[in-house]
């Protein structure tokens, strides 16, 4: 992870060095050499992804400086929302690293307290996925929609037994069910214990108003005020991510070009499923 960026970009190396000082460990070494068991811990992967995105953005603007003045809105999926706030000028890099590290620790702790999982249900609309969840949910357990990514791709989160029952229902109905390699049931009330810690961390984050608006995960609406972000971010970890609706919001605004900055191709893939004509360029490793 980040090998290409670190090899070619002095700016990227500088950001990773700064982040390592804040975190108290060599983040670049962890990204390059692992072990994956350490890198994949939510408490480590969240700052790693944030720093990677910031480094990719710096590298992107070095190559394409003209784009900086053309940006009309930003969005990011789950943790990516913090990278989007950084890109919009609402969150400094240093405070962003500390904030996502606190978020990662809080979510890791909440996930470790309960046996829970996430999974993707493929080829099914929202109403049918909700019906599967309602049928599979075990007494006293949580099972709910977590990420509404794009048509035919919805992630669910919940207690492990409810996930198991849902997998049987979905498979029996002839649809694809994919368990996700994540620490726990993100974007559900299982993460409720993490909210207080995140709110405390936000008090030190010194968010400011954004240069361009953010399309927020929780409501797919435009927001540009620091006071709004401080309320949206805690809600996000216990609420479904309305990603498809966020993409449609940007399309309805008349956005003519999308740029995906950072590792992975989530935007590229989900945008293609939402509107095949929408152009998207990806920049990362």
Task: List PLM regions with ranges.
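FabD-like malonyl-/acyl-CoA
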Residues: 1-130, 180, 257-284
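Alpha/beta catalytic cores of group-transfer enzymes, especially the acyltransferase/condensing modules
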Residues: 21-25, 68, 88-239
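Soluble or luminal CAZymes and related metallo-dependent hydrolases
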Residues: 11, 238-242
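A short, well-structured juxtamembrane/interface segment
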Residues: 241-249
